[in-house]
Amino acid sequence: AQVIGKSWTTTVGTSLLNKVYGVGFIPVFDVQLAFPYEKKISSYKADARFFVTQKLDGFRAIVEFDNGKVVSIKTRKGKVIDGLTELIEDIERAISADFGHIILDGELLLEDKENKWTSGERFQKTGQMISTDGECEGMGFHIFDALPYDEFQAGVSKLTYTERRQQYLEQFNK
């Protein structure tokens, strides 16, 4: 006898499937987001080391860089951002091909050389520039973190943030 004769849909998400079948069963594109430190400060050890960076109000982006060339620039949701030729050229000039295949995690922010926009205006102008067709001129990329491509895909780094910061980010500021 047939008990169920209908197709049933499910609301099972990728996080549950990855929990059941193992991390990476379904690849998830994700980046770490900032959070208010007040809620977590009590969980840190007294001698814990952490970094504080300025809030920029730009657009989070991931740059895939491989042997001297930018492969892609994506939003934090994984959507490719086009029209950043000038920025791509700047990144390729600034970063050595010796770094191999890496991911740069940072924030896109339209340059405000005259310092005339409020934070909100700058955010709005950056968003407008990114979302329109054509080339985006005057776009900057502020790097928060950098790690090897394979480690980004695995979601685990062999180095601490402090070590990555020393290895990569200091090199970029030269």
Where are these regions (language model features)?
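Structured, non-catalytic alpha/beta "coupling" segments that mediate domain-domain communication
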Residues: 2-24
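Covalent nucleotidyltransferase
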Residues: 45-173
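Short, charged/polar low-complexity linear motifs in solvent-exposed/disordered segments
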Residues: 16-19, 27, 89-92
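Charged, flexible boundary elements
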Residues: 23-54
